[in-house]
Amino acid sequence: MIIKPKVRGFICTTTHPVGCEANVRRQIAYTQEQGMIANGPKRVLVIGASTGYGLASRIATAFGSGAATIGVFFEKAGSETKTATAGWYNSAAFDKAAKEAGLYAKSVNGDAFSNECRAKVIELIKADLGQIDLVVYSLASPVRKMPETGEVVRSALKPIGETYTTTAIDTNKDQIITATVEPANEEEIQNTITVMGGQDWELWMAALRDAGVLADGAKSVAYSYIGTDLTWPIYWHGTLGRAKEDLDRAATAIRGDLAAKGGTAHVAVLKSVVTQASSAIPVMPLYISMAFKIMKEKGIHEGCMEQVYRMMRTRLYGEELALDEQARIRMDDWELREDVQQTCRDLWPSITTENLSELTDYTGYKQEFLRLFGFGLAEVDYEADVNPDVKFDVVEL
Protein backbone atom coordinates (compact mmCIF):
# COMPACT_ATOMS: atom_id res chain seq x y z
CA MET A 1 0.00 0.00 0.00
CA ILE A 2 0.98 3.66 -0.36
CA ILE A 3 1.21 5.16 3.12
CA LYS A 4 0.62 8.82 3.94
CA PRO A 5 0.70 10.52 7.35
CA LYS A 6 -2.59 10.92 9.24
CA VAL A 7 -2.18 13.12 12.31
CA ARG A 8 -4.72 13.24 15.13
CA GLY A 9 -3.86 15.30 18.19
CA PHE A 10 -0.38 14.37 19.37
CA ILE A 11 -0.30 11.08 17.52
CA CYS A 12 0.20 10.09 13.91
CA THR A 13 -2.07 7.10 13.25
CA THR A 14 -0.07 5.83 10.28
CA THR A 15 3.62 4.92 10.11
CA HIS A 16 6.00 4.21 7.26
CA PRO A 17 8.17 1.07 7.50
CA VAL A 18 10.80 2.28 5.02
CA GLY A 19 10.89 5.72 6.65
CA CYS A 20 11.30 4.24 10.13
CA GLU A 21 14.15 2.08 8.85
CA ALA A 22 15.79 5.12 7.23
CA ASN A 23 15.53 6.92 10.57
CA VAL A 24 17.23 4.06 12.40
CA ARG A 25 19.94 3.84 9.71
CA ARG A 26 20.62 7.58 10.12
CA GLN A 27 21.13 7.13 13.86
CA ILE A 28 23.40 4.13 13.31
CA ALA A 29 25.44 6.10 10.76
CA TYR A 30 25.82 8.99 13.22
CA THR A 31 27.03 6.61 15.92
CA GLN A 32 29.54 4.94 13.60
CA GLU A 33 30.88 8.33 12.44
CA GLN A 34 31.56 9.32 16.07
CA GLY A 35 33.69 6.25 16.66
CA MET A 36 33.77 3.59 19.35
CA ILE A 37 33.08 4.28 23.02
CA ALA A 38 36.21 3.34 24.96
CA ASN A 39 35.53 0.71 27.65
CA GLY A 40 31.85 0.69 26.69
CA PRO A 41 29.35 -1.98 27.75
CA LYS A 42 29.24 -5.36 26.01
CA ARG A 43 25.95 -6.91 27.22
CA VAL A 44 23.06 -4.48 27.49
CA LEU A 45 19.40 -4.63 28.47
CA VAL A 46 17.23 -1.71 27.34
CA ILE A 47 13.78 -1.54 28.94
CA GLY A 48 11.71 0.68 26.63
CA ALA A 49 13.90 0.14 23.56
CA SER A 50 11.74 0.96 20.56
CA THR A 51 11.60 4.76 20.27
CA GLY A 52 13.23 7.97 21.48
CA TYR A 53 15.99 7.78 24.06
CA GLY A 54 15.61 4.03 24.61
CA LEU A 55 16.13 3.25 20.92
CA ALA A 56 19.08 5.67 20.83
CA SER A 57 20.60 3.84 23.83
CA ARG A 58 20.29 0.52 22.04
CA ILE A 59 21.94 1.95 18.93
CA ALA A 60 24.71 3.73 20.88
CA THR A 61 25.72 0.59 22.78
CA ALA A 62 25.40 -1.83 19.85
CA PHE A 63 27.02 0.26 17.14
CA GLY A 64 29.21 2.42 19.39
CA SER A 65 30.41 -0.32 21.70
CA GLY A 66 29.79 -3.60 19.87
CA ALA A 67 27.33 -4.66 22.56
CA ALA A 68 24.94 -7.58 22.48
CA THR A 69 21.54 -6.06 23.27
CA ILE A 70 18.18 -7.25 24.54
CA GLY A 71 15.39 -4.75 23.93
CA VAL A 72 12.03 -4.77 25.71
CA PHE A 73 9.04 -2.85 24.34
CA PHE A 74 5.27 -2.96 23.89
CA GLU A 75 4.42 -2.42 20.22
CA LYS A 76 1.82 -3.54 17.69
CA ALA A 77 2.68 -5.44 14.52
CA GLY A 78 1.20 -4.44 11.18
CA SER A 79 -0.90 -6.44 8.75
CA GLU A 80 -1.35 -6.34 4.98
CA THR A 81 -3.83 -3.49 5.37
CA LYS A 82 -2.73 -1.71 8.56
CA THR A 83 0.55 -0.15 9.58
CA ALA A 84 2.41 -1.24 12.71
CA THR A 85 3.41 1.20 15.45
CA ALA A 86 6.59 3.16 14.73
CA GLY A 87 8.40 1.30 17.51
CA TRP A 88 7.70 -2.01 15.78
CA TYR A 89 9.30 -0.81 12.54
CA ASN A 90 12.18 0.81 14.44
CA SER A 91 12.90 -2.43 16.28
CA ALA A 92 12.65 -4.48 13.08
CA ALA A 93 15.12 -2.11 11.42
CA PHE A 94 17.48 -2.28 14.40
CA ASP A 95 17.30 -6.08 14.41
CA LYS A 96 18.10 -6.22 10.69
CA ALA A 97 21.05 -3.80 10.96
CA ALA A 98 22.45 -5.53 14.06
CA LYS A 99 22.37 -8.92 12.36
CA GLU A 100 24.03 -7.47 9.25
CA ALA A 101 26.80 -6.18 11.54
CA GLY A 102 27.14 -9.57 13.24
CA LEU A 103 25.79 -8.26 16.55
CA TYR A 104 23.59 -10.25 18.92
CA ALA A 105 20.12 -8.70 19.23
CA LYS A 106 17.01 -10.13 20.85
CA SER A 107 13.71 -8.32 21.29
CA VAL A 108 10.85 -8.99 23.69
CA ASN A 109 7.44 -7.52 22.85
CA GLY A 110 5.28 -7.40 25.95
CA ASP A 111 4.28 -5.43 29.03
CA ALA A 112 7.53 -4.42 30.74
CA PHE A 113 5.60 -3.85 33.98
CA SER A 114 4.72 -7.57 34.21
CA ASN A 115 6.55 -10.27 36.16
CA GLU A 116 6.16 -12.52 33.12
CA CYS A 117 8.24 -10.11 31.04
CA ARG A 118 11.00 -9.97 33.67
CA ALA A 119 11.08 -13.78 33.85
CA LYS A 120 11.35 -14.08 30.05
CA VAL A 121 14.19 -11.54 29.86
CA ILE A 122 16.10 -13.29 32.66
CA GLU A 123 15.67 -16.61 30.84
CA LEU A 124 17.11 -15.02 27.66
CA ILE A 125 20.06 -13.50 29.51
CA LYS A 126 20.90 -16.82 31.19
CA ALA A 127 20.64 -18.76 27.93
CA ASP A 128 22.47 -16.34 25.65
CA LEU A 129 24.59 -13.80 27.54
CA GLY A 130 25.11 -15.15 31.04
CA GLN A 131 25.10 -11.71 32.61
CA ILE A 132 24.60 -8.08 31.64
CA ASP A 133 26.73 -5.05 32.44
CA LEU A 134 24.31 -2.20 31.63
CA VAL A 135 20.58 -1.79 32.25
CA VAL A 136 18.92 1.21 30.60
CA TYR A 137 15.47 2.05 31.95
CA SER A 138 13.57 4.19 29.46
CA LEU A 139 9.88 3.41 29.79
CA ALA A 140 7.30 6.02 28.82
CA SER A 141 3.80 4.71 29.45
CA PRO A 142 0.63 6.49 30.55
CA VAL A 143 -0.71 3.37 32.29
CA ARG A 144 0.67 0.55 34.41
CA LYS A 145 -0.93 -2.79 35.12
CA MET A 146 0.19 -3.73 38.63
CA PRO A 147 2.09 -7.03 38.50
CA GLU A 148 0.59 -8.58 41.64
CA THR A 149 -3.05 -7.46 41.48
CA GLY A 150 -3.68 -6.78 37.79
CA GLU A 151 -5.08 -3.35 38.71
CA VAL A 152 -4.62 -0.78 35.93
CA VAL A 153 -3.30 2.56 37.20
CA ARG A 154 -3.42 5.71 35.04
CA SER A 155 -1.11 8.70 35.23
CA ALA A 156 -2.23 12.32 34.90
CA LEU A 157 -0.19 15.16 33.36
CA LYS A 158 -1.32 17.97 35.64
CA PRO A 159 -0.04 20.82 37.78
CA ILE A 160 -0.25 20.59 41.57
CA GLY A 161 -1.98 23.15 43.78
CA GLU A 162 -3.39 25.56 41.27
CA THR A 163 -4.83 25.78 37.78
CA TYR A 164 -2.15 26.39 35.17
CA THR A 165 -2.91 28.73 32.28
CA THR A 166 -0.35 29.39 29.60
CA THR A 167 0.33 30.03 25.93
CA ALA A 168 0.52 26.82 23.90
CA ILE A 169 0.31 25.57 20.32
CA ASP A 170 -2.73 23.76 18.97
CA THR A 171 -0.60 21.45 16.82
CA ASN A 172 -3.60 20.36 14.73
CA LYS A 173 -4.38 23.90 13.59
CA ASP A 174 -0.89 25.45 13.96
CA GLN A 175 -2.40 28.17 16.12
CA ILE A 176 -1.34 29.82 19.36
CA ILE A 177 -3.96 29.21 22.03
CA THR A 178 -4.38 29.68 25.76
CA ALA A 179 -4.26 26.29 27.44
CA THR A 180 -5.69 25.73 30.91
CA VAL A 181 -4.96 22.61 32.94
CA GLU A 182 -6.76 21.92 36.21
CA PRO A 183 -4.65 20.78 39.18
CA ALA A 184 -4.35 17.12 40.14
CA ASN A 185 -6.00 15.68 43.21
CA GLU A 186 -4.04 13.53 45.68
CA GLU A 187 -5.10 10.27 44.02
CA GLU A 188 -3.90 11.48 40.61
CA ILE A 189 -0.55 12.50 42.11
CA GLN A 190 -0.06 9.08 43.72
CA ASN A 191 -1.17 7.26 40.56
CA THR A 192 1.33 9.20 38.45
CA ILE A 193 4.12 8.27 40.88
CA THR A 194 3.00 4.62 40.64
CA VAL A 195 3.08 4.64 36.82
CA MET A 196 6.04 6.92 36.09
CA GLY A 197 8.11 6.75 39.27
CA GLY A 198 10.98 4.45 40.19
CA GLN A 199 9.16 1.43 41.62
CA ASP A 200 9.22 -0.61 38.42
CA TRP A 201 12.91 0.16 37.83
CA GLU A 202 13.57 -1.18 41.35
CA LEU A 203 11.54 -4.33 40.62
CA TRP A 204 13.57 -4.96 37.46
CA MET A 205 16.90 -4.45 39.20
CA ALA A 206 15.89 -6.68 42.14
CA ALA A 207 14.73 -9.44 39.78
CA LEU A 208 17.97 -9.27 37.78
CA ARG A 209 20.05 -9.25 40.98
CA ASP A 210 18.18 -12.18 42.54
CA ALA A 211 18.58 -14.20 39.34
CA GLY A 212 22.34 -13.58 39.41
CA VAL A 213 22.40 -12.04 35.94
CA LEU A 214 23.99 -8.68 36.87
CA ALA A 215 27.74 -8.70 36.22
CA ASP A 216 30.15 -7.29 38.78
CA GLY A 217 30.46 -3.56 38.16
CA ALA A 218 27.10 -3.43 36.33
CA LYS A 219 25.67 0.03 35.74
CA SER A 220 22.10 1.17 35.40
CA VAL A 221 20.68 4.45 34.16
CA ALA A 222 17.09 5.73 34.07
CA TYR A 223 16.06 8.77 32.06
CA SER A 224 14.43 11.89 33.40
CA TYR A 225 13.66 15.48 32.47
CA ILE A 226 13.62 18.50 34.76
CA GLY A 227 13.32 21.42 32.37
CA THR A 228 13.24 25.07 33.37
CA ASP A 229 11.03 27.62 35.07
CA LEU A 230 9.18 27.97 31.75
CA THR A 231 7.80 24.43 31.99
CA TRP A 232 8.00 23.76 35.73
CA PRO A 233 4.30 24.38 36.55
CA ILE A 234 3.20 21.52 34.28
CA TYR A 235 6.34 19.43 34.61
CA TRP A 236 8.73 19.49 37.56
CA HIS A 237 6.28 21.12 39.99
CA GLY A 238 3.43 18.97 38.67
CA THR A 239 2.53 15.28 38.85
CA LEU A 240 5.32 14.31 36.45
CA GLY A 241 7.88 16.01 38.67
CA ARG A 242 6.68 14.00 41.66
CA ALA A 243 7.14 10.81 39.67
CA LYS A 244 10.62 11.88 38.60
CA GLU A 245 11.52 12.67 42.23
CA ASP A 246 10.55 9.09 43.00
CA LEU A 247 12.96 8.01 40.27
CA ASP A 248 15.71 9.83 42.20
CA ARG A 249 14.69 7.95 45.35
CA ALA A 250 14.87 4.64 43.47
CA ALA A 251 18.30 5.51 42.03
CA THR A 252 19.69 5.99 45.54
CA ALA A 253 18.28 2.63 46.66
CA ILE A 254 19.52 0.76 43.57
CA ARG A 255 22.93 2.44 43.81
CA GLY A 256 23.27 1.21 47.40
CA ASP A 257 22.36 -2.27 46.26
CA LEU A 258 24.82 -2.40 43.35
CA ALA A 259 27.71 -0.83 45.28
CA ALA A 260 28.65 -4.11 46.97
CA LYS A 261 29.64 -5.53 43.57
CA GLY A 262 31.26 -2.35 42.26
CA GLY A 263 28.20 -1.29 40.30
CA THR A 264 26.34 1.99 40.15
CA ALA A 265 22.96 3.47 39.21
CA HIS A 266 22.05 7.02 38.26
CA VAL A 267 19.24 9.07 36.86
CA ALA A 268 20.34 10.88 33.70
CA VAL A 269 18.54 14.17 33.12
CA LEU A 270 18.18 14.67 29.38
CA LYS A 271 17.26 17.63 27.20
CA SER A 272 13.83 18.21 25.72
CA VAL A 273 13.35 16.48 22.39
CA VAL A 274 10.44 15.76 20.07
CA THR A 275 9.03 12.37 21.09
CA GLN A 276 5.54 10.92 21.23
CA ALA A 277 5.78 11.37 24.99
CA SER A 278 6.76 15.07 24.97
CA SER A 279 4.21 16.05 22.32
CA ALA A 280 1.46 14.95 24.73
CA ILE A 281 2.49 17.48 27.38
CA PRO A 282 0.84 20.93 27.14
CA VAL A 283 3.40 23.73 26.54
CA MET A 284 6.18 21.36 25.43
CA PRO A 285 5.68 21.76 21.66
CA LEU A 286 5.94 25.56 22.00
CA TYR A 287 8.88 25.45 24.41
CA ILE A 288 10.71 22.88 22.26
CA SER A 289 10.11 24.95 19.10
CA MET A 290 11.72 27.96 20.81
CA ALA A 291 14.61 26.05 22.37
CA PHE A 292 15.39 24.27 19.08
CA LYS A 293 15.66 27.53 17.15
CA ILE A 294 17.98 29.10 19.71
CA MET A 295 20.13 25.99 20.19
CA LYS A 296 20.46 25.43 16.45
CA GLU A 297 21.59 29.05 16.02
CA LYS A 298 24.20 28.53 18.75
CA GLY A 299 25.33 25.20 17.29
CA ILE A 300 24.41 23.22 20.41
CA HIS A 301 21.27 21.41 19.21
CA GLU A 302 21.06 17.67 19.87
CA GLY A 303 18.46 15.02 19.11
CA CYS A 304 18.01 11.75 21.04
CA MET A 305 20.91 10.04 19.31
CA GLU A 306 23.47 12.82 19.79
CA GLN A 307 22.44 13.28 23.41
CA VAL A 308 22.65 9.58 24.35
CA TYR A 309 25.92 9.02 22.51
CA ARG A 310 27.46 12.01 24.32
CA MET A 311 26.21 10.66 27.65
CA MET A 312 27.60 7.18 27.05
CA ARG A 313 30.95 8.34 25.75
CA THR A 314 31.72 11.33 27.96
CA ARG A 315 29.87 10.50 31.19
CA LEU A 316 28.73 6.93 31.83
CA TYR A 317 31.86 5.44 30.24
CA GLY A 318 33.89 8.64 30.19
CA GLU A 319 36.36 10.44 32.42
CA GLU A 320 33.84 11.62 35.00
CA LEU A 321 30.12 11.41 35.63
CA ALA A 322 29.94 15.12 36.63
CA LEU A 323 26.95 14.55 38.92
CA ASP A 324 24.72 17.22 40.42
CA GLU A 325 23.92 17.42 44.15
CA GLN A 326 21.24 14.72 43.72
CA ALA A 327 23.80 12.39 42.11
CA ARG A 328 22.18 12.81 38.70
CA ILE A 329 24.02 12.88 35.37
CA ARG A 330 23.05 16.20 33.76
CA MET A 331 22.84 16.09 29.98
CA ASP A 332 20.50 19.09 29.88
CA ASP A 333 23.53 21.31 30.54
CA TRP A 334 23.49 22.99 27.11
CA GLU A 335 19.73 23.57 27.08
CA LEU A 336 19.83 25.13 30.56
CA ARG A 337 22.51 27.65 29.65
CA GLU A 338 21.36 31.08 30.81
CA ASP A 339 21.70 32.61 27.33
CA VAL A 340 19.37 29.94 25.89
CA GLN A 341 16.80 30.22 28.68
CA GLN A 342 16.75 34.03 28.78
CA THR A 343 16.12 34.18 25.04
CA CYS A 344 13.20 31.75 25.55
CA ARG A 345 11.79 33.88 28.39
CA ASP A 346 12.03 37.03 26.27
CA LEU A 347 10.40 35.35 23.26
CA TRP A 348 7.51 33.59 25.03
CA PRO A 349 5.13 36.58 25.52
CA SER A 350 5.59 37.88 21.98
CA ILE A 351 4.66 34.72 20.08
CA THR A 352 1.45 34.79 18.03
CA THR A 353 -0.06 32.49 15.42
CA GLU A 354 1.24 34.88 12.73
CA ASN A 355 4.90 34.96 13.85
CA LEU A 356 5.11 31.39 15.22
CA SER A 357 7.10 29.99 12.30
CA GLU A 358 9.37 33.02 12.13
CA LEU A 359 10.24 33.39 15.84
CA THR A 360 10.48 29.68 16.65
CA ASP A 361 11.53 26.49 14.89
CA TYR A 362 7.95 25.21 14.81
CA THR A 363 8.54 24.06 11.22
CA GLY A 364 11.46 21.96 12.49
CA TYR A 365 9.31 20.67 15.34
CA LYS A 366 6.65 19.44 12.91
CA GLN A 367 9.27 17.83 10.66
CA GLU A 368 10.78 16.00 13.64
CA PHE A 369 7.33 14.91 14.81
CA LEU A 370 6.49 13.37 11.43
CA ARG A 371 9.92 11.78 11.27
CA LEU A 372 9.10 9.83 14.46
CA PHE A 373 6.56 7.95 12.35
CA GLY A 374 8.81 7.53 9.33
CA PHE A 375 7.61 10.48 7.23
CA GLY A 376 9.47 13.39 5.67
CA LEU A 377 12.82 11.70 5.03
CA ALA A 378 14.45 12.81 1.78
CA GLU A 379 15.86 9.36 0.99
CA VAL A 380 12.42 7.67 1.04
CA ASP A 381 10.07 7.38 -1.94
CA TYR A 382 6.63 7.93 -0.40
CA GLU A 383 4.81 7.17 -3.66
CA ALA A 384 6.19 3.62 -3.69
CA ASP A 385 4.04 0.66 -2.77
CA VAL A 386 5.24 -0.82 0.54
CA ASN A 387 4.23 -3.81 2.63
CA PRO A 388 3.19 -2.69 6.14
CA ASP A 389 3.52 -6.24 7.48
CA VAL A 390 7.16 -6.37 8.58
CA LYS A 391 8.35 -9.51 10.35
CA PHE A 392 11.45 -9.88 12.52
CA ASP A 393 12.90 -12.04 15.26
CA VAL A 394 10.87 -11.03 18.32
CA VAL A 395 9.70 -12.91 21.40
CA GLU A 396 5.97 -12.23 21.79
CA LEU A 397 4.51 -12.34 25.29
From Swiss-Prot:
User: One short Pfam family name for this protein?
Assistant: Eno-Rase_NADH_b
Pathway membership of this protein? Lipid metabolism; fatty acid biosynthesis
Q: What class of enzyme is it?
A: oxidoreductase
Does this entry carry the keyword Cell membrane?
A: no
* List of residues binding NAD(+): 48-53, 74-75, 111-112, 139-140, 244, 273-275
Give yes or no: UniProt keyword Oxidoreductase.
Answer: yes
Record comment: activity regulation? Resistant to triclosan.
Q: Which residues form a coiled coil?
A: none
Q: Name the keywords, alphabetized.
A: Fatty acid biosynthesis, Fatty acid metabolism, Lipid biosynthesis, Lipid metabolism, NAD, Oxidoreductase
Q: Provide the catalytic activity annotation.
A: a 2,3-saturated acyl-[ACP] + NAD(+) = a (2E)-enoyl-[ACP] + NADH + H(+)
EC number(s) per entry: 1.3.1.9
Q: Extract the InterPro entries matched here.
A: Eno_Rdtase_FAD-bd_dom, Enoyl-CoA_Rdtase_cat_dom, FabV-like_NADH_b, Trans-2-enoyl-CoA_reductase
The active site of this protein is located at 235 (proton donor)
Plays an important role in discriminating NADH against NADPH (site feature) positions: 75
- At which positions is substrate bound? 225
One GO biological process from the UniProt record? fatty acid biosynthetic process
GO MF, one annotated term: NAD binding
How this chain assembles, per its entry, is: Monomer.
Family, per the entry?
A: Belongs to the TER reductase family.
Q: Describe the task this protein carries out.
A: Involved in the final reduction of the elongation cycle of fatty acid synthesis (FAS II). Catalyzes the NADH-dependent reduction of the carbon-carbon double bond in the enoyl moiety that is covalently linked to an acyl carrier protein (ACP).
Query: What is the name of this protein?
Result: Enoyl-[acyl-carrier-protein] reductase [NADH] FabV
Which species is this record about? Answer: Aeromonas salmonicida (strain A449)
